[in-house]
Design a protein with these regions (language model features):
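Short, internal active-site loops enriched in acidic
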Residues: 267-268, 274-281
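A short acidic/basic microdomain associated with nuclease active sites
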Residues: 166-193
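Short secondary-structure boundary/capping segments
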Residues: 215-219, 285-293
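Conserved structured core elements
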Residues: 150, 154-158, 181-184, 234-241, ...
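A short acidic (Asp/Glu
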Residues: 186-188, 278-287
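Interfaces and regulatory segments of ATP-dependent nucleotide/adenylate/phosphodiester-chemistry enzymes
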Residues: 1-167, 288-401
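Active-site beta-strand-loop-beta-strand hairpin of nuclease catalytic cores
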Residues: 192-211
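Catalytic cores of nucleic-acid endonucleases
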Residues: 205-270
Length: 401
């Protein structure tokens, strides 16, 4: 990951979390994983037959050596009946049976000296978008929150593009954060090309409002989708369409060239939108965004027409991108061919991950974790073991035997 991005994140955002909660980000994540292991490390049948295993004692669950950090962690994660009641009965635009915000904030319910996870999924979410909101809720000023949104967006872009580069490695040409030759401004977040087919990637880490997702009211959802991801001035679809018409202008004398990449013989450009929220990449919202992109491209072409084909917009999320990287450990996988095949299917109500599963079956590709992913997971658990037990995971396993 780019050093300047991590430095900015360390200096600004991590300082907020450490100062106001007493925990560093890696420490907070380790405690979340440690508590989550109690549930995912067991057979569901065992939890159903022995309900007491579902309860944790906040005072003793983590080792005594990390007591202060454990208290800080539980201070963020424990919810009470009174707190839940206040939040769940507050007047909002959310449909009550979709309103789990209180449980997402504090996924452990305090009960007479012990606690119970409302649902392990709420704990797991703290390792994803929940981390953002945990940091967000520690911030006190709009300037701090704005800084967090900008930095989180840049981190998301950087992570996705690095992962896509790994998914494309060994085949075709992938250019991260390509810039226009005339002014050195960024054109797309990433470009993949074989000289004839080009894939243009745009990443968007924005969050939809809770009322947009959970009110069951299209009048709230659609404007929010358009504003953050669609054809608004800062919307991702408008950016993609505008840059496509500039790079592939039918009037070749007015084309804007990408530095370090020859696209003069490209006859097909595939637009890809990578989002953070699964809600945005879900089949119905992806279909809406694909249709919205088609309309936006038509408007842009009235000003600058293009001389290449532009099939359907493909919408995917971070989970899909990680699956694409794993797929590239198989020699039969080709990222450009994969997304081109999905784009050729048109604006269908078809989840990208479902498509990828079908595509992998046809190509004989495994979507299971590979050695790279296994190595990263092992490194995380080694770090957790050192934090809580001051020894490697292998030593813990030997003692258990």
């Amino acid at each position: 990951m780019n050093a300047h991005v991590i430095d900015a994140f360390d200096e600004i955002v991590l300082a907020f979390l450490k100062t106001r909660t007493g925990m560093e980000v890696s420490e907070y994540l380790d405690f979340n994983i440690g508590s989550l292991v109690n549930y995912i490390g067991r057979d569901p049948k065992e939890l159903m037959e022995k309900a007491d295993l579902y309860f944790l004692n906040p005072a003793t669950f983590f080792p005594a050596e990390v007591k202060e950090s454990a208290e800080n962690f539980w201070g963020l994660e424990l919810g009470s009946l009174e707190r839940y009641q206040d939040e769940l009965t507050a007047v909002t635009k959310l449909v009550p049976h979709h309103n789990f915000t209180a449980f997402r904030k504090r996924p452990f319910f305090r009960t007479n000296g012990t606690c119970i996870a409302i649902h392990p999924c709420f704990v797991q979410e703290k390792l994803e978008a929940g981390l953002f909101w945990t940091i967000f809720h520690t911030l006190q000023h709009d300037t701090e929150r704005d800084a967090l949104f900008r930095l989180w967006g840049r981190l998301f872009e950087t992570y996705i593009i690095e992962t896509l580069a790994a998914a494309a490695k060994g085949k075709n040409q992938f250019l991260p954060f390509p810039k226009y030759r005339d002014n050195n401004q960024e054109a797309f977040d990433g470009i993949l090309s074989d000289g004839k087919i080009c894939v243009a990637f745009e990443c968007k880490a924005g969050f939809l409002k809770a009322e947009s997702k959970f009110s069951e009211d299209p009048k709230l959802l659609i404007p929010d989708l358009e504003d953050k991801f669609g054809s608004s001035k800062s919307g991702a679809l408008r950016q993609i369409a505008s840059n496509i018409t500039q790079v592939f202008n039918k009037n070749r004398t007015q084309r804007r060239e990408i530095d370090g990449l020859d696209l003069s013989k490209v006859h097909v450009v595939v637009p890809i939108l990578v989002v953070q929220e699964k809600f945005v990449s879900s089949p119905l919202t992806a279909y809406f965004l694909a249709d919205s992109f088609r309309s936006e491209l038509r408007k842009q072409r009235l000003v600058r027409d293009i001389d290449c084909q532009c099939p359907s917009l493909v919408v995917m999320d971070a989970y899909d991108v990680e699956a694409l990287r794993v797929s590239n450990s198989n020699s039969a996988f080709d990222l450009l061919n994969c997304v081109f095949e999905r784009s050729r299917l048109g604006d269908q109500v078809y989840d990208f991950h479902e498509f990828l599963i079908d595509y992998a079956k046809v190509k004989g590709i495994s979507l299971k974790s590979d050695s790279v992913m296994d190595g990263k997971i092992k490194a995380i658990f080694e770090r957790i073991s050192e934090r809580f037990f001051h020894r490697p995971v292998s030593d813990n396993a030997e003692q258990a035997i």
